[in-house]
UniProtKB/Swiss-Prot annotation:
It comes from Trifolium wormskioldii. Its main location: plastid. The lineage of its organism: Eukaryota, Viridiplantae, Streptophyta, Embryophyta, Tracheophyta. GO terms for molecular function: RNA binding. Belongs to the intron maturase 2 family. MatK subfamily. It comes from the Eukaryota. Pfam families: Intron_maturas2 (PF01348), MatK_N (PF01824). This is Maturase K.
Amino acid sequence: MKEYRVYLERARSRQQDFLYPLIFREYIYGLAYSHNFNRSIFVENGGYDNKYTLLNVKRLITRMYQQNHLIISANDSNKNPFLGYNKNFYSQIISEGFAIVVEIPFFLQLSSSLEEAEIIKSYKNVRSIHSVFPFLEDKFTYLNYVSDIRIPYPIHLEILVQILRYWVKDVPFFHLLRLFLYHFCNWNCFIPTKKSISTFSKSNPRLFLFLYNFYVCEYESIFLFLRNKSYHLRLKSFSVFFERNFFYAKREHLVEVFSKDFSYTLPFFKDPNIHYVRYQGKCILASKNVPFLMNKWKYYFIHLWQCFFDVWSQPRTININQLSEHSFQLLGYFSNVRLNRSVVRSQMLQNTFLIEIVSKKLDIIVPIIPLIRSLAKAKFCNVLGHPISKPVWADSSDFDIIERFLRICRNLSHYYNGSSKKKSLYRIKYILRLSCIKTLACKHKSTVRAFLKRSGSEELLEEFFTEEEEILSLIFPRDSFTLHRFHRNRIWYLDILFSNDLVNDE
């Protein structure tokens, strides 16, 4: 990274065309090759007969410039006619190279912005998924309306490339990137489909994630820009990392849409208590005041996507609901605001009064049905939640089988320990425990009853229920009251950076 930093500092004096030469640096493709296959570029790979060299990549790029895109067919063979090598393999390597090169300036600017804001030490904790829920507990109990928003896709990558050109001044690099997308990914269709997006994301995951995250970052920066301009209140939790020179031209059309109908109304309706939370492709928008303001932001989003990103979005896809009557799903939890009513007797002189107190509490619970559906998909139970054996693991040793089930149980317990109600989590543990017992009984060709009688049911698999208590006892005092209280309350962990699929935990 020091070499990249020195190179970019020299290139900034020219202010353009500083990424294009990196495409022809061999260590870039060495990083891409190691990222995909976890092997060195010079190590022989039997599947490709060691035909991968930088010379072949340069030849492929040259052919991309010379190719007539009018005769490209969607049913082209995977074999490249002018090289005779596997086309998918080279497209994946070049895609990784593009992703690595285009990430460099954004990563360096992001790092410098974090250093200036002096939040490097707390940045890891902020990245945790669970850091969102203390924010929800603190803010959402004072809000009244919530809106679930699904970020629309697919978006044509040509639009993203055009926007990228205004962030990084390097015309040859983005011209080559556009040729690559049209040549290998069949992006010559006018309207991309979800199937083509899915195919591209699987064959070029790193480049797809970068382009998608850039799309989300671009729309969020515009949204926060509009919010700051509308309310004249600067957000302390957000800072613009990059220059804005393309947005101001596009914003004129966006402002015209609202200036006709709301020019005399909007200044009297300002809502500083609007809160926005996003994870992956879903975001939550919550507000305290009247639904009119939520409708205003609803149409802000719709016109932003349609006018700026050319993505069609229907108004009926964004629903506005009351928090007290609607539960929203975020990060694998179901959340809603519950009203707690209590009556207090108050006495003043000779008179006695009954005062009703209403308090709000954010309930965050485990979604039992989606979890059982995931367990059924991974063959731990049937669709009704009845545990079944997993014969695929029967060839492993008893220790490995128990360790695999414990790892899944540990991850689920670690992630869903913030639930208000632990009954659903205990049911998931029970399913995994019986599935483990049935798998061991299947391996030893015995019934569950006979296997438990022979091995001892009390000693077997006791880690499913004791391990979490042992971990808590290392953190908190070992008295029973404290442990019981922490079993009942929520515990959020600041070391969870992503949620694993059950199938990937094998």
